[in-house]
Regions:
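Bacterial N-terminal signal peptides that target proteins for export
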Residues: 2-12
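Cleavable Sec-type N-terminal signal peptides
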Residues: 4, 20-22
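Bacterial N-terminal signal peptides
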Residues: 11-20
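Gram-negative and organellar
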Residues: 24-437
Length: 437
């Protein structure tokens, strides 16, 4: 019996987390990680097209992620007129997902998703977000295959690591290309290139703008349920501007080497482990500021005791950074537990309980904004609890209800917060063509 490993991803998709790092049980894979992995061949593939529309109403009782002692929001740097700690957000969305088969092993994928996000009170935060992808999946003979494509993301920058509270739109663009050479049915050699561009619209955040170029090489041995392999990634990141941190000129450019062993192994018919472990070294021009070298690892254990229940346990140690603050990065160690229950063909419940600690690497304990100095690097502890219900009354309609709470404690008082969120969303697939879910 083959374990349905795709359910790990579906459980993650149902979960809304305040902290992205709390989703690390399901390892973050960038566009190139996805492109070089063995591709699961879909059965009965056809040309397909899905058009959808939706609406999401969300409530957030701490939009700016402020500590409790701040009561007068009008004194905060950069904040808009008539600010409110609590707010409702209405997000109207539209999307298109398509696949065109142009040959036996050739296809084009297109995904376009846009949201208009309207804040009821903090109207200066209104924004348009999007998450788009176009990719060409190619194959040559029986042994060569790969992907070429572009991913684009546009979001409102969060307020978890900032002391300026104006609207900042963050965009990330990934350009990627990969190739896999299959040596027989089990062994494979892969490689690829990745270019990434970060841009932050707010003037106070432009020091985080960067362009990076990466190369990935590796090999693996795969079966129907198992995979063992290794990969090496080199990344060269360049930022246009230097910044002054704690009185020292800091160059955000860096070079990074990462080597990992990759493992996916079915322990039993009901238990699967997906893990990686390796070593990462990051070097900055300022030899005494910001350099990091050490082990990184992650393990996710999926247990499916019945066809309708699943438990996912994750632990990790990674080098991470907030999307809006690429120069302010940290060592993230955490654990999460994700139960999932398919109550019926139409209703699924899931939850996430997570805890992680973030130890900021000595580039700066709090970033370039001067506040009360501290004698040690910043250290945060985050906890989060989230519950979700997904209801599909008919195949074309999906309704999701979500509620969550998160807390961050820090040795820098400005970064304490408690946050409660809730949301109700509905998505209607009003047009479907081909073999679509």
């Amino acid at each position: 019996m083959k374990i349905p490993t795709r359910k790990i991803a579906s459980a993650a998709a149902m979960t809304t987390l305040t902290s992205v790092s709390l989703a690390a049980a399901i390892e973050y894979r960038d566009a190139l990680d996805i492109a070089v992995a063995p591709r699961e061949e879909a059965l009965e593939r056809t040309d397909s097209l899905v058009l959808s529309a939706g609406d999401r109403i969300a409530y957030n009782d701490n939009v700016y992620l402020l500590p409790g002692y701040i009561t007068d929001l009008t004194t905060l740097p950069g904040i808009g007129p008539n600010p409110s700690r609590k707010d409702y957000i209405d997000s109207i969305s539209g999307g298109m997902d398509a696949e065109w088969l142009t040959g036996g092993r050739q296809s084009f994928d297109l995904g376009l998703h846009a949201d208009y996000n309207r804040y009821f009170r903090n109207q200066d935060l209104n924004n348009v977000s999007s998450n788009d992808r176009v990719a060409w999946n190619w194959g040559l003979g029986n042994a060569l295959s790969g992907q070429v494509g572009v991913d684009y993301q546009r979001i409102l920058g969060g307020f978890s690591n900032t002391l300026v509270y104006s609207r900042a739109i963050v965009t990330r663009t990934d350009y990627f290309g990969s190739m896999r050479y299959q040596i027989g049915p089990r062994w494979g050699i892969f490689g690829g290139v990745l270019g990434t561009e970060y841009n932050v619209s707010a003037a106070q955040g432009t020091f985080n703008n960067s362009k990076s170029r990466g190369v990935d090489l590796g090999a693996d041995f795969t079966t129907d349920t198992n995979r063992i392999g290794f990969d090496y990634r080199f990344n060269d990141s360049r930022a246009p501007n230097s910044i002054v941190l704690n009185g020292i000129v800091f160059e955000p450019d860096y070079r990074e080497d990462r080597a990992r062993v990759l493992l996916k192994y079915a322990l039993t018919e009901k238990t699967l482990i997906d893990a990686s472990a390796g070593y990462l070294k990051r070097q900055y021009p300022n030899g005494t500021i910001g350099n990091f070298s050490g082990e990184i690892w992650r393990a996710a254990l999926q247990w499916q005791p019945t066809p309708k229940t699943q438990l996912l346990l994750g632990v990790w140690r990674q080098l991470d950074a907030d999307l809006t603050s690429q120069t302010d990065y940290f060592v993230d160690k955490g654990v999460s537990l994700t139960p999932l229950w398919i109550a019926s063909e139409k209703i699924t419940f899931s939850a996430v309980i997570g805890r992680d600690t973030n130890n900021y690497v000595g580039s700066n304990p709090i970033g370039p904004i001067p506040v009360a100095p501290i004698t040690e690097a910043r250290h945060d502890t985050l906890t989060s609890e989230t519950a979700n219900m997904l209801y599909t009354p008919i195949r074309a309609i999906t309704i999701t209800v979500s509620a969550g709470h998160s807390t961050r404690n820090s040795n820098v008082s400005q970064f304490h917060y408690n946050d409660v969120q809730g949301s109700l969303s509905i998505v209607y697939k009003f047009f479907r063509y081909g073999n679509t879910p």
